[in-house]
Structure formats: C-alpha cells, structure tokens
Regions:
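Residue-level signature of catalytic and energy-coupling elements of molecular machines
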Residues: 11, 24, 41, 57, ...
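Conserved Rossmann-like nucleotide-binding pocket used by diverse enzymes
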Residues: 2, 7, 27, 52-54
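Conserved redox-active cysteine motifs that mediate thiol-disulfide chemistry
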Residues: 26-40
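Conserved helix-turn-beta segment immediately C-terminal to the redox Cys motif
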Residues: 19-21, 36-56, 60-62
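A short beta-strand-turn-helix
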Residues: 3-22, 62
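Structural micro-motif
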Residues: 22, 68-77, 92-95
Length: 101
C-alpha cells in the first residue's frame, strides 16, 4: 500500500481509529531533508502491511502540525491506539525509521 495523504478531514478515521500502528511523516514540499525522507517512507508503506503510513503536508495542515507540536520538519510520529508512542525530528535512514516502529 502507498502512503496516505492525511488532512484534517480524514485524520480521525485514518489515524485515530486505525487498527494498525500509524507512521506519520510531517513534511513540506520546500523542505530539502523532507524530500530525502519521502522515498524511504513510501518504500516502508509498500513493504509493510502491518502498519499504515500517512503523510501530512504542514503548509496545508497547520492545525495538525500544531496539534502534534511540530516545530521542525521532517518530523516522524508513530501512533498506536490513538496515542503517540514514538516521535523523531530530522531526516533518518530507513533502519532508524523502522526501529521507531
């Protein structure tokens, strides 16, 4: 499965009500480090059926970024049962992102 674009209208259903852990990637198109993380996140989404992967564009969804206290991007957040269980800022290699799960 590919990563899902998360916004205010689908956040509750896709993230909070998910029966799988959710990896959220807070990003923006102008962010260089974000562009390095996007292909890794997409690859994880395709490889792992046991998790859901969502991308949140902070320019289009500032309220979600604020809700998670995102101060710099990329920020990766892992949610389970509607709760944050892991969070990391900055570009990371695939192994470090997988270790968050």
């Amino acid at each position: 499965m590919s990563a899902i674009n998360i916004n205010q209208s689908n956040f509750q259903n896709e993230v909070m009500n998910s029966d799988k852990p959710v990896l959220l990637d807070f990003w923006a198109p102008w962010c260089g480090p974000c562009r390095m993380v996007v292909p890794i996140v997409e690859e994880i989404a395709r490889e792992r059926d046991d998790i859901k992967v969502g991308k949140i564009n902070v320019d289009e969804n500032p309220e979600l970024a604020g809700q998670f206290g995102v101060m710099s991007i990329p920020t990766l957040v892992v949610m389970k049962n509607g709760k944050i269980v892991n969070q990391s800022m900055g570009a990371k290699p695939k192994s470090a992102i997988l270790a968050m799960l």
